[in-house]
């Protein structure tokens, strides 16, 4: 559970929001800080991308899917696992979806 702006925000045991409708960009900053990440414009690009992906496909992207989709949209420079791991060192799919207020990707351990 998180306390944000005086409200209790329910999370699962790993810190993923139970209700993605409670997500906001200011809340994302708090979640990122809990993950040890200070959000840069590059982080926001990925966070917004995974949110859009989720809205379109109704699923959070696992790492392979995330890399491929990022490459299709942004090119090889940003659509590769090295770039994404620099931004999200504990796992791009896990951390980006958590910060984006989405469910944990199905194929993530």
Swiss-Prot record:
UniProt entry tagged with the keyword Transferase: yes
Reported impact of residue 108 to S: Loss of activity
InterPro entries per record: DsrC-like_C, DsrC-like_dom_sf, DsrC-like_N, DsrC/TusE
Superkingdom field: Bacteria
Pfam families referenced in this protein's UniProt entry, alphabetically: DsrC
Top-level EC class: transferase
Gene Ontology molecular function: sulfur carrier activity; transferase activity
Alphabetically ordered keywords of this record: Cytoplasm, Transferase, tRNA processing
Location relative to the cell: Cytoplasm
SUPFAM superfamilies: DsrC, the gamma subunit of dissimilatory sulfite reductase
One cellular-component annotation, GO: sulfurtransferase complex
The keyword Cytoplasm appears for this protein: yes
GO BP, one annotated term: tRNA wobble position uridine thiolation
UniProt-annotated catalytic positions: 108
EC number: 2.8.1.-
Main location: cytoplasm
Quaternary structure (record): Interacts with the TusBCD complex. Interacts with MnmA.
Reported function: Part of a sulfur-relay system required for 2-thiolation of 5-methylaminomethyl-2-thiouridine (mnm(5)s(2)U) at tRNA wobble positions. Could accept sulfur from TusD.
UniProt similarity note: Belongs to the DsrC/TusE family.
Protein name: Sulfurtransferase TusE
Species of origin: Escherichia coli (strain K12)
Gene name of this polypeptide: tusE
């Amino acid at each position: 559970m998180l306390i944000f702006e005086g409200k209790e925000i329910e999370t699962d045991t790993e810190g993923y929001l139970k209700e993605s409708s409670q997500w906001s960009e200011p809340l994302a900053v708090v979640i990122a800080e809990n993950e040890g990440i200070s959000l840069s414009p590059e982080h926001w690009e990925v966070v917004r991308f995974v949110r859009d992906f989720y809205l379109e496909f109704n699923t959070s992207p696992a790492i392979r899917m995330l890399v491929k989709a990022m490459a299709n949209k942004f090119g090889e420079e940003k659509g590769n696992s090295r770039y994404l791991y620099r931004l999200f060192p504990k796992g791009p799919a896990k951390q980006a979806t958590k910060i984006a207020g989405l469910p944990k990707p199905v194929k993530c351990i």
